[in-house]
Amino acid sequence: MKIAVYGKGGIGKSTTSCNTSIASARRGKRVLQIGCDPKHDSTFTLTGSLIPTIIDTSQSKDYHYEDVWPEDVIYKGYGGVDCVEVGGPPAGAGCGGYVVGETVKLLKELNAFYEYDIILFDVSGDVVCGGFVVLLNYADYCIIITDNGFDALFAVNCIAASVREKARTHSLRLAGSVGNRTSKRDLINRYVEACPMPVLEVSLLIEDIRVSRVKGKTSFEMVEFQPFLNYVCEFYLNIADQILSQPEGVIPKEIPDRELFSLLSDFYLNPTNNERENKNQETLLDFMII
């Protein structure tokens, strides 16, 4: 199973990817995480360092790919997760998306692409150019990371459009969205009502999640020394369980930009209406509990 993780830049894709990779490994799966960002820091919390990239290795071999072996580009990370970093060309030169495509070709030539139960692509930012979106050609599922904010949900909508387009010719489905480090989910709820998609999980605004990234450790590694953080790991185990169940997924129908702008901006411009809706929902829940 191949999963592509997208989302707005800085939204927490790498944090979510690393922890979900470990959660999948904890379920007995063999996992490969491929960092598809020129910053090459996707697997930092898995390996504890910035591992050499495909670009670095290729340069050291004078671009003789026949001299590249799996152990030259695949590094063992925490929890038994294997890691690859694609890297990218210098800033302002070349196409990072092209390098990603070449990485997939190289892994296929090394017979490494088909040896895993789960391959997770952690993709750069919210880009929708053909170079990075080409990863959707290889994916069975896409997961979009968001928060309860205006900009992040705009990115979700743009990525949803890319998924719909690729699903025309590939057996690709949107597994769902993941809310990351957000104290509320009311704006997420409003969006998924207008553009139906599953919400796999919403992690709370937990400082320990941010700190784990700074420390270069996953939540699963931190819990070995801070057992009270075990509840954080449950978020990622839940995501992994849903993915491993091979969900039906959806082909999303994105919202036209102007309609989306009105939908999301109205949420901020008319807070009274939103509070009334929330109270109605709470009242309904009270009756349901009774």
UniProtKB/Swiss-Prot annotation:
PROSITE patterns referenced in this protein's UniProt entry, alphabetically: NIFH_FRXC_1, NIFH_FRXC_3
Residues given in the record as ATP binding sites: 10-15, 39, 180-181
Reactions that this protein is recorded to catalyse: chlorophyllide a + oxidized 2[4Fe-4S]-[ferredoxin] + 2 ADP + 2 phosphate = protochlorophyllide a + reduced 2[4Fe-4S]-[ferredoxin] + 2 ATP + 2 H2O
One example of a Gene Ontology biological process annotation: photosynthesis, dark reaction
Domain of life: Eukaryota
Residues noted as binding Mg(2+) in the record, renumbered to the chain: 14
Transmembrane segment boundaries: none
Keyword line: 4Fe-4S, ATP-binding, Chlorophyll biosynthesis, Chloroplast, Iron, Iron-sulfur, Magnesium, Metal-binding, Nucleotide-binding, Oxidoreductase, Photosynthesis, Plastid
Ligand binding ([4Fe-4S] cluster): 95, 129
Cofactor note: Binds 1 [4Fe-4S] cluster per dimer.
Subcellular location: Plastid, Chloroplast
Listed cofactors: [4Fe-4S] cluster
Pfam families reported in the protein's UniProt record: Fer4_NifH
Gene Ontology terms: cellular component: chloroplast
Keyword Disulfide bond attributed: no
Single annotated GO MF: ATP binding
Principal subcellular localization: plastid
HAMAP family associated with the record: ChlL_BchL
Function statement: Component of the dark-operative protochlorophyllide reductase (DPOR) that uses Mg-ATP and reduced ferredoxin to reduce ring D of protochlorophyllide (Pchlide) to form chlorophyllide a (Chlide). This reaction is light-independent. The L component serves as a unique electron donor to the NB-component of the complex, and binds Mg-ATP.
Family: Belongs to the NifH/BchL/ChlL family.
Assembly and oligomerization: Homodimer. Protochlorophyllide reductase is composed of three subunits; ChlL, ChlN and ChlB.
Identification of the protein by name: Light-independent protochlorophyllide reductase iron-sulfur ATP-binding protein
Organism field: Anthoceros angustus (Hornwort)
Species lineage: Eukaryota, Viridiplantae, Streptophyta, Embryophyta, Anthocerotophyta
